[in-house]
């Protein structure tokens, strides 16, 4: 049975929150293999640093220490795109949603993901891309919020790195929620999707037809 985790974090320095860590420990205790799928497939050095860390960032695999003891770690980008992505855990990294989505579709990883029955981690843009409808909230680079067609493994559309104190982000989510339901997920929270079951870990905000429901 496929389990999908929709996360905002961890970031390059800060790790998982206690609530998310405790949840992951329950489901990753037997996991031995993990495959990371890049959002910057052309930049292998950046991807290596993002996964394994350097003197400036912790690295995703190091954030997972204490949660799981992986024996095999794979990184899939343009240099390693012929690797078999099937593993106990597949991790869609954060970053640029467009380059990751194109890379996944061009290499038909989306078809593999649809038939995959392991644990799927989706962080930030990875969590946006895995949905039927991804959502991009306007920022300094994008003038208008928009939806786009994602991979379609879940109907849960998230707004990652959500801050309820950010009035612009909140008002955009309210406005856009008349088209599709949006879940605001702070960095300390996540959503777990397993078949038709949805579980909120930490504080999550649901936007639906302009209304807001807080789950805690």
Predicted regions and their residues:
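C-terminal and late-domain segments of enzyme folds
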Residues: 2-30, 36-51, 136-216
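Structural motif
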Residues: 6, 35, 89-93, 121-122, ...
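Glycine/Thr-rich phosphate-binding loops of Rossmann-like dinucleotide-binding domains
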Residues: 14, 44, 100-101, 130-131
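Catalytic-core regions built around general acid/base machinery
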Residues: 23, 106-118
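Short, well-ordered alpha-helix to beta-strand connector turns
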Residues: 31, 68, 86-88, 116-117, ...
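A glycine-rich, hydrophobic loop/mini-helix early in the fold
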Residues: 41-97
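Catalytic nucleophile loop
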Residues: 93, 113-133
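Glycine/threonine-rich flexible loop motifs
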Residues: 97-106
